[in-house]
């Protein structure tokens, strides 16, 4: 009888451990991914607005050193691990953060309102990327006119890497709690 009770206890304990890992793998993974996407999108949107405000200075009659601006664009891009484009209203890239690799690229059927009520989109951005990217845009305005847009693209793989690191922490915490519950 005692042996049967002990085996049931061990079986219940193992089932509890398995259910804990499955819960982390399903619920926590999705919640973490959604949180990271929204968090990165908000941070990139704020950065895009800052860059757009800097671009807007030249439309307000202030001089802008384009070489300095280009260098700053590259530095921000490197720091954020993103690709940054400045495009005109027609969707032609006029400046980028990758040493001009995308300059004069035409974004087919460019529609800055395509994001709807969200501040970001996820996809290959008009099939211009080989992998999915998180893209945000901010208008470049001056004198109540929109002259173009600042677009920032973050590879979704960067978000997946962060998600993986966070889930590793959750799995380790689960294992520690599981081991400590034996005491």
What spans do the regions from the language model cover?
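Amphipathic alpha-helical bundle/coiled-coil segments
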Residues: 84, 134-137, 153
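Extracytoplasmic/periplasmic sensor domains and loops in membrane signaling proteins
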Residues: 70, 92-131
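Helix-start (N-cap) segments at beta->loop->alpha junctions
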Residues: 59, 141-143, 151-171
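Selective recognition of signaling/oligomerization transmembrane alpha-helices
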Residues: 167-183
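Extracytoplasmic/secreted envelope proteins and their assembly/folding machinery
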Residues: 70-73, 137, 156
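Juxtamembrane segments flanking the first transmembrane helix
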Residues: 2-93, 98-101, 161, 168
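A short beta-strand signature within small-molecule sensing/ligand-binding domains used
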Residues: 121, 129-141, 148
């Amino acid at each position: 009888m005692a042996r049967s009770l002990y085996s049931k206890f061990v079986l219940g304990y193992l089932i509890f451990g398995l259910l804990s890992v499955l819960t982390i793998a399903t619920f926590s993974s999705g919640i973490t991914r959604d949180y990271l996407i929204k968090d990165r999108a908000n941070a990139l949107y704020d950065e895009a607005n800052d860059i757009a405000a800097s671009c807007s200075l030249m439309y307000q009659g202030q001089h802008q050193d384009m070489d300095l601006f280009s260098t700053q664009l590259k530095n921000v891009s490197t720091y954020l691990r993103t690709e940054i484009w400045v495009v005109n209203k027609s969707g032609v890239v006029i400046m980028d953060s990758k040493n001009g690799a995308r300059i004069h690229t035409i974004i087919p059927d460019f529609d800055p309102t395509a994001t709807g009520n969200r501040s970001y989109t996820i996809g290959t951005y008009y099939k211009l990327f080989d992998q999915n990217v998180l893209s945000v845009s901010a208008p470049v305005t001056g004198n109540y006119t929109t002259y173009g847009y600042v677009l920032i693209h973050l590879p979704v793989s960067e978000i997946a890497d962060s998600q993986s690191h966070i889930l590793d922490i959750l799995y380790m915490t689960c294992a520690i709690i599981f081991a400590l519950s034996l005491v």
